[in-house]
Amino acid sequence: MELNVFAGQEKSELSMIEVARAILEERGRDNEMYFNDLVNEIQNYLEKSNSEIRAALPTFYSDLNVDGSFIPLGENKWGLRSWYAIDEIDEEVITLEEDDEDAPKRKKKRVNAFMDGDDDAIDYGHDDPEDEDNYPGSVSSEYDDENPDDEKDEVESYDQKSTKLSQMTNWMKRMLI
């Protein structure tokens, strides 16, 4: 295999990431590669021994994940991020989130280590009104995330407090001078 991109360069000076990018670019969008196949082609191109590749493999895999030009496509297949429009990537993420919403959520059963199967023991954990967010005066019952007016009120309240604080600070500075 010969990569025209590296014509005139010494193979020993090339990084595995550079070679991986060149291999994927040459193959094109419809030819994503399994990680193992990609590593084998890199090894063949760079003419490295198995022991050299094994030693460099953890670093290469980390670089592949960190480098922004590669994208994992699932099932250990890799491609170039430039092959995919941002909308395509986002749709895949949204699809996964929608699947999670459809799945029924299981409630976790609370286990009390002190109950130890004793039917006569009193469980004080279920009758504490402070454990519930629905008691009168609760912040969560007054604030509605969906209501933009609540957010506006919160910002105005913060601004008022901030203004008062700066006024007090200025007054204190004048008193000290």
Curated annotation (Swiss-Prot):
Residues 117-134, 142-157 have a biased composition (Acidic residues). One of its GO terms (molecular function) is DNA-directed RNA polymerase activity. It holds the Pfam family HARE-HTH. GO terms for cellular component: DNA-directed RNA polymerase complex. This is Probable DNA-directed RNA polymerase subunit delta. Keywords: DNA-directed RNA polymerase, Nucleotidyltransferase, Transcription, Transferase. It comes from Streptococcus suis (strain 98HAH33). One of its GO terms (biological process) is regulation of DNA-templated transcription. Coiled coil: none annotated. The gene is rpoE. RNAP is composed of a core of 2 alpha, a beta and a beta' subunits. The core is associated with a delta subunit and one of several sigma factors.
